[in-house]
Amino acid sequence: MSAHYFNPQEMINKTIIFDERPAASVASSFHVAYGIDKNFLFGCGVSITSVLLHNNDVSFVFHVFIDAIPEADIQRLAQLAKSYRTCIQIHLVNCERLKALPTTKNWSIAMYFRFVIADYFIDQQDKILYLDADIACQGNLKPLITMDLANNVAAVVTERDANWWSLRGQSLQCNELEKGYFNSGVLLINTLAWAQESVSAKAMSMLADKAVVSRLTYMDQDILNLILSGKVKFIDAKYNTQFSLNYELKKSFVCPINDETVLIHYVGPTKPWHYWAGYPSAQPFIKAKEASPWKNEPLMRPVNSNYARYCAKHNFKQNKPINGIMNYIYYFYLKIIK
């Protein structure tokens, strides 16, 4: 059944393919997709590496949907494909139809690429795995690859707890969400059911409605929860273990990452590729970085006042007071010149 709201021929300006798979594995390959802008390229490359490191008996095709990509990163992705004998496809997205959609200071229009991605695979793949670029894999994905989605549009993991679901349900005026509000960073998508539900068309219609948009906090995620309410399969939290590295600033917290965790989702503004994220909880990302073409890339420094403030806080937490003072000075400098 073909029901593309976003026609691949219109939405993809160019596709660059690096296919280093052994011929025997091509037919059985499983498809994993990311939707990013250039700010998440570092994370995306390392995320792909982490999947490969922990699933070396699986043949993959990785798809990176992005609006523009530097040549240096194209070459790194080519090197990654060659090193791990995998396939990586870079899809350059035409963003014209997305430019009118609402964005926030933290999320660009790249958050809507997941709709383009799901439509792209209609009639091509029965099932695909969408991952946010701030996810590190440390376990076996075969249970997801073989999972029967039945008539569900997607398999998902809930976000936070029942109290949070209730609050989101109230804000979004959808009582069904009290049974479960999901995080959209990991989506195992049933492309046939997605097409039958016209998910992308419904999403774009809702995002054009000011009354609906006024109720949204997490644009794409809230919309997906509204459209897919009662049409998703909730799966174990180990497949989207959400953890903010800013929890490390607290006096005490419970880290949900353990040996059973398969996919770690580093939610929040501090990412594992930031130099101030030097905690054991970021090590799964760092280990994958060291096994990737980004191994010699320095961890990122703060590029705006918000990051400078978090950087300073983490410096003090890590007993680096000189760095903390310098970054607070940098924070105030950035605030003044803004």
Give the positions of each predicted feature:
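Short internal beta-strands
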Residues: 60-68, 155-157
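Hydrophobic targeting segments
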Residues: 31-34, 51, 61-64, 264
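A glycosyltransferase accessory/donor-loop signature
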Residues: 1-30, 36, 191-338
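Histidine-anchored nucleotide/phosphate-binding helix
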Residues: 41-55
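A recurrent flexible, glycine/aromatic-enriched loop bordering the glycosyltransferase active site
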Residues: 175-186, 213
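GT-A fold catalytic core of metal-dependent nucleotide-sugar glycosyltransferases
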Residues: 91-96, 110-165, 181-197
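Active-site-proximal specificity loops/subdomain of glycosyltransferases
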Residues: 73-120
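Short, surface-exposed amphipathic charged segments that create phosphate/polyanion-binding patches used
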Residues: 101-110, 169-172, 249-254
